Structure formats: structure tokens, C-alpha cells
A protein has these predicted regions:
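Surface-exposed, beta-sheet-biased, low-hydrophobicity segments with strongly acidic/polar composition
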Residues: 1-89
Length: 89
């Protein structure tokens, strides 16, 4: 699915097939040594050899020619953890 600039997507554990060129999915959420939330997300085959990447609030990732910025990681130590990403490019 193509997204407009400014569109927001929620990424939880498992697959999210709403990303053009995806899927993108959450693999793990936790707090780092400084108490900041971190997420490990998996992406499409063109992310090889890094199938999974660690992201923090403010980081960006690209999928399907679209660039996304992580705006929040919620309840990182909960089974209901998720992150929010906004399309910026």
C-alpha cells in the first residue's frame, strides 16, 4: 500500500503487510541500559543481510522507496508493545 507523506502506521509483534515493499514487523521490544525504549523490527528481503534492525525513537528506516521515522515506542516491556512510525519521505 502506498502511503501519503505524514501517514502513520502502528507496528506490533508479527507482520504488518500495509507497507508498500514490505512486510515490516516487530520482533522484540525492550528498554536499554538508560531506560529508553528500543524495538527490533524485521523487514523485506532488500534489507539483507540485516533482516532485523534495532530502532529507537527518532530513527528512520526505508521500505518500498518510502522513508519512515519512529515517533514512539509504547509499553516496551509489555506483550502489548508497539511502535508508531510516520512517513517522512
Amino acid at each position: 500500500m502506498a502511503h501519503e507523506l505524514g501517514a502513520q502506521e502502528k507496528i506490533t509483534y508479527g507482520r504488518n503487510d500495509r507497507f508498500e515493499g514490505g512486510p515490516v514487523g516487530g520482533g522484540r521490544f525492550w528498554l536499554d541500559e538508560q531506560g529508553r525504549p528500543v524495538a527490533k523490527i524485521g523487514g523485506p528481503p532488500d534489507w539483507q543481510p540485516e533482516v532485523m534492525i534495532d530502532v529507537r525513537i527518532g530513527d528512520t528506516f526505508a521500505v518500498g522507496g518510502q522513508t519512515w521515522r519512529i515517533t514512539d515506542i509504547v509499553d516496551a516491556e509489555s506483550p502489548k508493545a508497539y511502535l508508531l512510525a510516520v512517513r517522512v519521505g
